[in-house]
Curated annotation (Swiss-Prot):
Purpose of the protein: Lipid transferase that promotes unilocular lipid droplet formation by mediating lipid droplet fusion. Lipid droplet fusion promotes their enlargement, restricting lipolysis and favoring lipid storage. Localizes on the lipid droplet surface, at focal contact sites between lipid droplets, and mediates atypical lipid droplet fusion by promoting directional net neutral lipid transfer from the smaller to larger lipid droplets. The transfer direction may be driven by the internal pressure difference between the contacting lipid droplet pair and occurs at a lower rate than that promoted by CIDEC.
Gene: Cidea
Known partners and oligomeric status: Homodimer. Interacts with CIDEC. Directly interacts with CEBPB. Interacts with isoform CLSTN3beta of CLSTN3; inhibiting the lipid transferase activity of CIDEA.
Record flagged with keyword Nucleus: yes
Gene Ontology biological-process entries: apoptotic process; cellular response to cold; fat cell differentiation; lipid droplet fusion; lipid metabolic process; lipid storage; negative regulation of cold-induced thermogenesis; negative regulation of execution phase of apoptosis
Gene Ontology terms for molecular function: lipid transfer activity; phosphatidic acid binding; protein homodimerization activity
Protein's name in the database: Lipid transferase CIDEA
SUPFAM superfamilies: CAD & PB1 domains
UniProt cross-references to InterPro entries, sorted A to Z: CIDE-N_dom, CIDEA_N
Deletion consequences: Mutant animals appear normal and fertile and produce the expected Mendelian ratio of heterozygous and homozygous descendents. They are lean and resistant to diet-induced obesity and diabetes. They exhibit higher metabolic rate, lipolysis in brown adipose tissue and core body temperature when subjected to cold treatment. Mutant females are unable to properly feed their pups who die within 3 days postpartum due to severely reduced milk lipids.
Principal location class: other
């Protein structure tokens, strides 16, 4: 009986430990990595770059970098004034989203480049590329460069290049040179193969035979 009891206890202990670990994992809140964003005041006279992983952290850092002492503020999207007041909505936004902080009594207004939809001119361009250089820290070497490409006014792709230190700049430069060398090598291989194929086809074509029809007439 004691042996069976000891065996049952030894079997239950690992199961209990696994249950506690599973409960601990499920109850542990999901920690999101810090992402880059842009923030500005109500009249867009001051803009800053901020790294934040949550809505509360973004608001706190925005108040610090823009030197806002008012406790009651509202965070909205700069492009259309949509209020961002929930963590779920904040996590769905893309990196480098532009925000605007509004103090009590302030209202969102469209920027100088904003044109109502009914008055927007028709654009015939296929693609548009924009560059945005900003700094997350005054001590950064060059800052961060955001490259955004928009195709047919429908699809957009953005890439963030961080040049916060000289080593990072050198690393990105070497990476670009390596990629350019690979592309150049592939182009030369394809061009050489194509030229050899054209020359081979030219050599295989038979030379035209002289006509002897007039000799026997």
């Amino acid at each position: 009986m004691e042996t069976a009891r000891d065996y049952a206890g030894a079997l239950i202990r690992p199961l209990t430990f696994m249950g506690l670990q599973t409960k601990k994992v499920l109850l542990t809140p999901l920690i999101h990595p810090a992402r880059p964003f842009r923030v500005s005041n109500h009249d867009r006279s001051s803009r800053r770059g901020v790294m934040a992983s949550s809505l509360q952290e973004l608001i706190s850092k925005t108040l610090d970098v823009l030197v806002i002492t008012t406790g009651l503020v509202t965070l909205v999207l700069e492009e259309d004034g949509t209020v961002v007041d929930t963590e779920e909505f904040f996590q769905t936004l893309r990196d480098n989203t532009h925000f605007m902080i509004l103090e009590k009594g302030q209202k969102w207004t469209p920027g100088s480049k904003y044109v109502p939809v009914c008055k927007q001119p028709k654009k015939s361009g296929i693609a548009r590329v924009t560059f945005d250089l900003y700094r997350l820290n005054p001590k950064d070497f060059l800052g961060c460069l955001n490259v955004k490409a928009t195709m047919y006014e429908m699809y957009s792709v953005s890439y963030d290049i961080r040049c916060t230190s000289f080593k990072a700049v050198l690393r990105n430069l070497l990476r670009f040179m390596s990629y350019a060398a690979q592309m150049t090598g592939q182009f030369l291989v394809y061009a050489g193969t194509y030229m050899l194929r054209v020359l081979g086809d030219t050599e295989e074509q038979p030379s035209p035979k002289p006509s002897t029809k007039g000799w026997f007439m």
